[in-house]
Amino acid sequence: MDSSCHNATTKMLATAPARGNMMSTSKPLAFSIERIMARTPEPKALPVPHFLQGALPKGEPKHSLHLNSSIPCMIPFVPVAYDTSPKAGVTGSEPRKASLEAPAAPAAVPSAPAFSCSDLLNCALSLKGDLARDALPLQQYKLVRPRVVNHSSFHAMGALCYLNRGDGPCHPAAGVNIHPVASYFLSSPLHPQPKTYLAERNKLVVPAVEKYPSGVAFKDLSQAQLQHYMKESAQLLSEKIAFKTSDFSRGSPNAKPKVFTCEVCGKVFNAHYNLTRHMPVHTGARPFVCKVCGKGFRQASTLCRHKIIHTQEKPHKCNQCGKAFNRSSTLNTHTRIHAGYKPFVCEFCGKGFHQKGNYKNHKLTHSGEKQFKCNICNKAFHQVYNLTFHMHTHNDKKPFTCPTCGKGFCRNFDLKKHVRKLHDSSLGLARTPAGEPGTEPPPPLPQQPPMTLPPLQPPLPTPGPLQPGLHQGHQ
């Protein structure tokens, strides 16, 4: 039994070093208390690369910004992995991991230095204060995969870089050239404006960036070239804004405007709504009827203006004859009567008119065609307007009544003509036609002095019955 215990003890002592070696070679746990409580060292600011030193102003101290800084910084695109060429035997997510761990210099441009994603991000953060004064000249890089590129742009294309399509074949990992565009507002503060550019199939949606040369450093550009690029970029930006604000849904800006032609008279309109309002001229439809006088109108707005006629307010008065009107436009037309101005002259008979409406109605009398006919008495008219008022004669609807004799009329015009011809002439107050120039109203009748009657005499006493004695005595 002692021998068996001795053998067991020997085996335990022999396996103890092996177990110690296994424990020492095991990986440390990611959630260990020591790693959690350990203080994370702050990242060191990288020195400025030599190819960026020429673009920075000298004489000013540089303050490095760390990744955990609270100061916001504008990055031209979301950081992605950069790689010069796909490595053989590496597939899936390994190229991205390999490029992050060991960045290599670009093979196409041996003189251009390469930096990893963290280097570019650290440089952009450290040079954030100089972005408003100088452009960052970046060299050529290659995107690992196309993706949406979000960045905040500056005024007039800004000091950040724009991406354009490369000259190589369309491949997910093909080269994407990055070139700087000088900012027109170098001394102005940065105003972020969110924009999104889509990098799909190696084609970035950037308008007309092919006009700028790719792969040109900022220090190699002359002042004239910078001024040219600044003006051109501002012009491109204004054209882009004008194109977005233009009415793109209605067609191209260079397209001819749509016209709507009336099939009856050939009149042209720029909108279909105006053509619809014009068609009742030919159809004769007047759906808007005045409830006071029964006059019909093609438009509701005309009916609203017509209703002012039936009101008692007439603020616009003629200075020559004292006649008052509801609207100033009617007064202006009335002044043509006193001036004898008749701009609308009939080309058939030479008769002049003060108003265009009366001129059009008169021209229809020369046509000889009366297409609007009454169904009751077969009387024809040139206009449907006259036929509408003629129908009142058959239904005994006469809204205008003479206050003197009580006779009714269909139109107010007929009532005024009746009063002027009959009642004014009977009272001796007939008016002269106002249309004839140089006519004056008749002078008033001379006033006669009042008649004076002689004073009244007292009446004579009536004689009484004669007495016989007195009568005989006189004899």
Swiss-Prot record:
Report the protein name in the record.
Fez family zinc finger protein 1
Gene3D superfamilies for this protein? Classic Zinc Finger
**Entry keyword set:** Developmental protein, Differentiation, Disease variant, DNA-binding, Hypogonadotropic hypogonadism, Kallmann syndrome, Metal-binding, Neurogenesis, Nucleus, Repeat, Repressor, Transcription, Transcription regulation, Zinc, Zinc-finger
Q: Is Transmembrane among this UniProt entry's keywords?
A: no
Question: What is this protein's function?
Answer: Transcription repressor. Involved in the axonal projection and proper termination of olfactory sensory neurons (OSN). Plays a role in rostro-caudal patterning of the diencephalon and in prethalamic formation. Expression is required in OSN to cell-autonomously regulate OSN axon projections. Regulates non-cell-autonomously the layer formation of the olfactory bulb development and the interneurons. May be required for correct rostral migration of the interneuron progenitors.
> Per its UniProt record, what SMART domains does this chain match?
ZnF_C2H2
Effect of changing residue 278 to Y: reported as: In HH22; partial loss of function
Regarding protein family, the annotation reads: Belongs to the krueppel C2H2-type zinc-finger protein family.
Cited Pfam families? zf-C2H2 (PF00096), zf-C2H2_6 (PF13912)
For the keyword Nuclease, the answer is: no
**In what ranges is there compositional bias, type Pro residues?**
439-466
Could you list the residue ranges that cross the membrane? none
Coarse class of the primary localization is nucleus
- Disease linkage: Hypogonadotropic hypogonadism 22 with or without anosmia: A disorder characterized by absent or incomplete sexual maturation by the age of 18 years, in conjunction with low levels of circulating gonadotropins and testosterone and no other abnormalities of the hypothalamic-pituitary axis. In some cases, it is associated with non-reproductive phenotypes, such as anosmia, cleft palate, and sensorineural hearing loss. Anosmia or hyposmia is related to the absence or hypoplasia of the olfactory bulbs and tracts.
Any one GO MF annotation of this record: DNA-binding transcription factor activity
**What gene is this protein a product of?**
FEZF1
Zinc finger residue extent: C2H2-type = 260-282, 288-310, 316-338, 344-366, 372-394, 400-423
Additional note from the record: Triggers oncogenic activity specifically in gastric tumors through activation of KRAS in the ERK signaling pathway.
Q: Name one GO biological process term.
A: forebrain anterior/posterior pattern specification
Q: Where in the cell is it found?
A: Nucleus
- Gene Ontology, cellular component aspect: cytosol; nucleoplasm
- Positions occupied by motif Engrailed homology 1 repressor: 28-43
List the residue ranges of the region (Disordered).
428-475
Tell me which tissues or organs this protein is expressed in.
Expressed in brain. Little or no expression in other tissues. Overexpressed specifically in gastric cancers. A 2- to 20-fold increase is found in over 50% of gastric cancer tissues.
